[in-house]
């Protein structure tokens, strides 16, 4: 069984390189056929909203909407429940395919025998 790559993005426009790294690694793994679970936490939670990824710009980086689309197509994208609540984001507000789940789900995914977790 292939290992699942669990990527936790904690940064958004406040730390663009770290944000881009998380999305790039997740999308690259998905493109390589690795099972991927991308978690949007902290300031990256905003990218669960339609159109928000398009507002992100980092020179010499792949467009965030393309990276997010790649992960959505081949893996899972999860918005942190508490992060969403702190930002007034509801489950009906997010991009289709994004689920909302909390710490217990993250811990279960990240500690599975077949998982490798990365936090950016």
Task: For the regions a language model picked out, list residue spans one by one.
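Aromatic- and Gly/Pro-rich donor/ligand-binding loops
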Residues: 118-120
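A short aromatic-anchored loop/beta-hairpin motif
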Residues: 87, 91-95, 100-108
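A glycine-rich helix N-cap at a beta->alpha junction
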Residues: 54-84
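Residues at the starts of beta-strands that form the adenosine-phosphate
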Residues: 4, 35-37, 76
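N-terminal beta-loop-helix "entrance" segment that forms/cooperates
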Residues: 44-58
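Small/aliphatic-rich secondary-structure junction motif
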Residues: 32-47
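Histidine-anchored nucleotide/phosphate-binding helix
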Residues: 19-32
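Short, glycine-rich nucleotide/cofactor-binding loops
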Residues: 6-20, 51-52
């Amino acid at each position: 069984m292939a290992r699942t790559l669990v990527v936790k993005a904690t940064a958004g426009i406040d730390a663009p390189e770290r944000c881009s790294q998380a999305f790039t690694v997740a999308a690259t793994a998905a493109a390589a056929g690795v099972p991927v679970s991308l978690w949007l936490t902290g300031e990256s939670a905003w990218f669960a909203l339609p159109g928000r990824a398009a507002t992100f710009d980092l020179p010499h980086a792949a467009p965030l909407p393309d990276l997010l689309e790649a992960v959505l197509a081949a893996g899972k994208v999860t918005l942190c429940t508490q992060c969403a609540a702190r930002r007034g984001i509801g489950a009906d507000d997010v991009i289709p395919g994004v689920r909302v789940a909390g710490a217990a789900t993250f811990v279960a995914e990240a500690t599975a025998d077949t998982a490798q977790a990365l936090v950016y």
